[in-house]
């Protein structure tokens, strides 16, 4: 299954590792390269560096072709 995860923080990273272990094809979008680097070293993912809310990053990740899209970005009040 093709999964796109929007956000590589604590929750996004945990979900990514679980989904990769289950054999899913996971793409992760995050604006912080260091988060993507850390996650890439722990799991076989396709990292996309960019604003998780931008149309460009979502297009680069082919979010429209994903079987599952998960957004785990922080809540800002």
Region spans (language model):
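Cytosolic regulatory regions of ion transport systems
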Residues: 1-77
């Amino acid at each position: 299954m093709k999964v796109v995860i929007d956000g590589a923080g604590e929750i996004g990273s945990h979900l990514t590792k679980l989904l990769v272990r289950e054999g899913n094809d996971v793409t992760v979008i995050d604006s912080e390269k260091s988060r993507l680097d850390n996650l890439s070293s722990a799991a076989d993912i396709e990292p996309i560096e960019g604003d998780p809310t931008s149309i460009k990053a979502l297009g680069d990740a082919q979010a429209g072709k994903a079987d599952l899209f998960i957004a785990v970005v922080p809540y800002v009040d």
